[in-house]
């Protein structure tokens, strides 16, 4: 999409575009919305990737919500509250990703058909409280790795998507830490590597 070559000075820093050129570029292809001539990514590929991120966040909302409703056992009320809080935060991620897809000219895919195959993480209910915590920790670890890869992928080609994912990653890392701490509290020791 980027048809505007970046000129560089002797030190390698890009020249700043003059205001008149910026104004002229902004008037071209206004139907493209936020996607301007300086957008460095592949819009269709970005939307495709973000559809997978959206599916992942939807699955996380569903899993955390299910666990918030069904968790039982000693100290389950505090864990249920943690699950409910995470579901709320995952829903905020879901909305941010859906809005970004829309900004790029796509239609967010909320269709439940095929949701599990589009998602990086799996939907697992867990048989008991510890299983639920483990499933959420696994899902968060998948999300952390996936989002780190995507942040590197988008790099400077799509800084807005990258920054959005960096914000989501920060929360996903907090969720993973929360689930790890809950697992240690309920198993009485740090989990061993498999």
Question: PLM features: what roles do these ranges have?
Answer:
Residues 1-194:
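Iron-associated oxidoreductase/ferritin-like identity signal
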């Amino acid at each position: 999409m980027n048809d505007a070559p970046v000129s560089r000075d002797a030190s390698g820093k890009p020249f700043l575009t003059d205001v008149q050129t910026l104004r002229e570029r902004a008037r071209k292809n206004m139907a493209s919305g936020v996607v301007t001539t300086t957008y460095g990514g592949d819009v269709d590929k970005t939307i495709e990737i973000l559809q997978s991120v959206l599916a992942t966040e939807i699955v996380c909302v569903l899993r955390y919500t299910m666990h918030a409703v069904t968790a039982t056992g000693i100290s389950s009320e505090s864990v249920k509250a943690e699950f409910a809080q995470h579901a709320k935060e995952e829903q905020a991620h879901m909305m941010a990703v859906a809005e970004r897809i829309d900004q790029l000219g796509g239609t967010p895919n909320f269709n439940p058909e095929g949701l599990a195959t589009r998602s990086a993480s799996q939907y697992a209910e867990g048989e008991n409280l510890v299983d639920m915590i483990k499933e959420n920790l696994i899902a968060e670890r998948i999300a952390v790795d996936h989002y780190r890869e995507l942040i590197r992928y988008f790099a400077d080609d799509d800084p807005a998507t990258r920054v959005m994912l960096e914000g989501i990653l920060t929360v996903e890392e907090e969720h993973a830490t929360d689930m790890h701490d809950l697992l240690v509290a309920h198993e009485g020791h740090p989990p061993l590597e498999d």
